[in-house]
């Protein structure tokens, strides 16, 4: 049995779970999430816990078992506490600002880059070089953070660009030759 899949998911107070066939809807203080799961996985609500069961020990069912449980846990966690991803801007003159709902990045291009967050995702700019992305959907928060980072990925020579908060950029040495040649 999958070690992750067999763990029950505790449903906290104030979180409402609706099971309609293979479509699960979770509603909590931070919002509502709905997702369709594989029809082979059997999801039940027993004594305040969500339990995922699989029909057989086939390889694909074992893989889906852990995946389904983790996705359900992320849904419950998201509507209860929410998820946050932090980004940092490294570079002279690199700034982030918020205009209404949009994020405006000044990162060395000839034009400012504007990014509109999807519904249910909130962008905060606590400092000119810091960005915080918050939301109840873990996948959407992570995807938006990856899209913002992709606008100007950190380069290996000076480390300039947009990086995740605790990301370590592997640095390279610059050109060594060319000093004594004429």
From Swiss-Prot:
The keyword Coiled coil does not apply. GO terms for cellular component: cytosolic large ribosomal subunit. GO terms for biological process: cytoplasmic translation. It comes from the Bacteria. Gene3D superfamilies: Ribosomal protein L6, alpha-beta domain (3.90.930.12). GO terms for molecular function: rRNA binding; structural constituent of ribosome. Keywords: Ribonucleoprotein, Ribosomal protein, RNA-binding, rRNA-binding. It holds the Pfam family Ribosomal_L6. PROSITE patterns: RIBOSOMAL_L6_1. Belongs to the universal ribosomal protein uL6 family. This protein binds to the 23S rRNA, and is important in its secondary structure. It is located near the subunit interface in the base of the L7/L12 stalk, and near the tRNA binding site of the peptidyltransferase center. Part of the 50S ribosomal subunit. This is Large ribosomal subunit protein uL6. It comes from Desulforamulus reducens (strain ATCC BAA-1160 / DSM 100696 / MI-1).
